[in-house]
């Protein structure tokens, strides 16, 4: 399994620390920021750290969120996804992070969720199988899944 080595230098955690010293939710935020990066106006309809603009939202084409705005939006979205899976306790953040990237529809039909429902904790292969974009396997998505499962999965 991959060793997670993200340096944490946010204002809340001023000294450099290992990501593994942080709460699960904060780990997920850092991982998403690392892999999504702050989207530019050309990435429309995505803003911030991968938020897909929904009908009725006040974002307009060509807008660029500040880091603070993007961070707040990421935390709001991730909290919403984690809440969808709150009945899974310690796994809610892992499932929320997957839903943030793939969507809750994909997670709800996934082998990962089915295994966790029946108490099977052997989810590595199932979790890391979510590495396709437009039908093609992507190494970047695989690395993201390795990082997520290493930092967010509590055996």
Summary of predicted features, one role per range:
Residues 10-41, 51-87, 105-155:
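Long, amphipathic alpha-helical surface segments
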Residues 1-7:
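Bacterial N-terminal signal peptides
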Residues 45:
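Short, His- and charge-rich active-site/binding loops that engage polyanionic ligands
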Residues 92-106:
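Long, amphipathic, charge-rich alpha-helical segments that form helical bundles/coiled-coils
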Residues 48:
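Short, highly charged
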């Amino acid at each position: 399994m991959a060793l997670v080595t993200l340096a944490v230098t946010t204002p809340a955690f001023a000294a450099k620390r290992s990501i593994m010293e942080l709460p699960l939710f904060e780990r997920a935020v850092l991982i998403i920021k690392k892999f999504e990066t702050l989207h530019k106006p050309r990435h429309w309809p995505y803003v911030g750290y991968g938020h897909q603009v929904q009908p009725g939202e006040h974002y307009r084409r060509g807008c660029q969120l500040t880091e603070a705005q993007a961070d707040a939006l990421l935390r709001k979205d991730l909290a919403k996804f984690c809440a969808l899976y709150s009945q899974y306790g310690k796994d809610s953040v892992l499932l929320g992070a997957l839903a943030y990237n793939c969507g809750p529809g994909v997670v709800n039909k996934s082998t990962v969720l089915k295994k966790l429902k029946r108490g099977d904790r052997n989810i590595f292969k199932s979790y890391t199988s979510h590495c396709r974009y437009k039908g093609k396997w992507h190494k970047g998505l695989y690395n993201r899944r390795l990082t997520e499962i290493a930092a967010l999965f509590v055996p």
